[in-house]
Amino acid sequence: MVSANGDLHLPISNEQCMPENNGSLGFEAPTPRQILRVTLNLKYLIDKVVPIVYDPNDIVCDHSEILSPKVVKLAYEACGGNPKDKANKRKYQSVIIFSLLKVCEWYSILATMEVHNAKLYETRNLASQQLCKLLIEREETRDLQFLFMQLLLRRYVINENDEDQEPLNALELATDMHCTTVIGSSGFQRCLKWIWRGWIVQNGLDPTTFIKDDSLAEVSLISHFNPVRLKAPVYQNYLQMIFSFLFLGLYTLVVNGKDSERVQSFDLLESIFYVFNTGFILDELTKLYYIGYAHLSFWNLFNDTTYLIITFAMGFRAMSVTPLNAKYSSEDWDKISYRVLSCAAPFVWSRLLLYLESQRFIGIMLVILKHMMKESIVFFFLLFLIMIGFTQGFLGLDSADGKRDITGPILGNLTITVLGLGSFDVFEEFAPPYAAILYYGYYFIVSVILLNILIALYSTAYQKVIDNADDEYMALMSQKTLRYIRAPDEDVYVSPLNLIEVFMTPIFRILPPKRAKDLSYTVMTIVYSPFLLLISVKETREARRIKYNRMKRLNDDANEYDTPWDLTDGYLDDDDGLFSDNRNSGMRATQLKNSRSLKLQRTAEQEDVHFKVPKKWYKNVKKCSPSFEQYDNDDTEDDAGEDKDEVKELTKKVENLTAVITDLLEKLDIKDKKE
């Protein structure tokens, strides 16, 4: 959407994102062939800028001589467009991050295909990521809305090998490729934070586009009491955590609550527990159906194993209370059921980590475990080959006399040797001296060589993550955020509440689409009402601060913290009552606090005429600081020239308006005190 002064803003309604209203998004996206040309131009630029292998620190360091301001300017120019038409130029510059990430993908493919040049392609890959980071951080200070709407969130289609690829945005592409340098940039993280909070949401009419939540600055409780707000990843995460702890509590009561040898029928808690498990299974099957094999990951398989064990236990439990003639008695089925259910305890407790990974410590720990599991594949592959070879040798020794005598003990001993519990006694009287020689070799290889290889692999994986812990954690959170916004459901029924949706699906199919949507809306409002009330209270307080920021012409996420080094930041939300008729009390209190703080500070500094630092001191400080003028200059001089006068004019207007509002608030405060 284009404002009166030519700036781009996120659309705030579904209708603005309809195909017939593409102009309201600022401009139409470039065609797939045009995006391919931009990507080829950027690849040519990186090839020339990085002709040889450089030290990675020379590329990623601040004010790098390799990725100089001139390179940044050339990257913008590689997008083409009319330099005299800002809208036309921005249209093609909007794909620059997407195209650079595609270049990264191409370099990764080349590094795999041409191993002899892998180091060079990895260096170019890093240079492409760093250039993305520089561009994102530059646009964050110039045009935040353009960064979010066009560069990171808009989905583009590129033509590769004469075929149009699936639409993707830069946010998804960087996360899928694990580009930690790009993900770790401040603008990227800021965009993720807005999506995580639900400030930017998917368009209800077209899930491939994003819009700004239109209730963000609404200061009434009822405007935020809306189940649509549950689409925000932060609230879905909270709901999943709540249901996970409830699931754990129910499991504990069920598995440790049996106090009789007699077979008892299903009680209320046990029934609710198995309903929870059924809801989780249904959710996994739904996601597998819509997403396919891409849904399968370590944690998904881990959860599936948990649900499968509990399902077996539920089946055995049903057998124990069903009056059927079976091989075993009801008591035996009941005993088997509780024993199988007990085996799920480590899984049920460990799955909590999946929902607590948003905490930095747990998130980093999970990333370390993930890397260790990947590294251990090498160990287990080698171990498998070694075990197969020695097992075949021992079985050959056992069958040399035409019969097999100790096959079972041999296999058992070879297996427990991996755990350090192997015994030489099994082979003392078996095919001397061949069996002993074989086992000595096996024991040495497993205990000395392979186990030390495993330790070294784990140490490498740990060090790799710890050295890059912050970026790895941010990449993990990016993946977590995308899991929520890529969910197939338009209505949020968090497991096990998805069973409600299943039971009501026949009714939804019968009703007209609008009536079905209204019914679903009503059901979600009733089911989630306690949680929606908490959301409303939280977001209403945030809305007052956002409204204050917009009055001050600041970004919505400004003034979240009251820092001691800035006397004019922060917001006094304590002065806002949830049911107060005066919705501007917090704004007034904040304005008065700021003016009072500045006045007190100014008065304290003026008590001693010799206290004030001379202006010359500031000039000397600037002189002694390192000079990065050539890096700090805005290389898009045309844009700077156009915006300079406009910024000055707006600054004057804001200062005048702030002064008027401050005086007015002081007068109102005096008037209220008199009354």
Swiss-Prot record:
Bilayer-spanning residue ranges: 237-257, 296-316, 336-355, 377-397, 406-426, 437-457
Signal peptide: none
Keywords, alphabetical: Calcium, Calcium channel, Calcium transport, Ion channel, Ion transport, Membrane, Phosphoprotein, Transmembrane, Transmembrane helix, Transport, Vacuole
Cytoplasmic side: 1-236, 317-335, 398-405, 458-675
Topological domains annotated Vacuolar: 258-295, 356-376, 427-436
GO cellular component: fungal-type vacuole; fungal-type vacuole membrane; plasma membrane; vacuole-mitochondrion membrane contact site
Membrane topology of the entry: Multi-pass membrane protein
Residues found modified as Phosphothreonine: T636
Protein role: Required for release of calcium ions from the vacuole in response to hyperosmotic shock.
Name the UniProt record assigns to this protein: Calcium channel YVC1
Gene behind the chain: YVC1
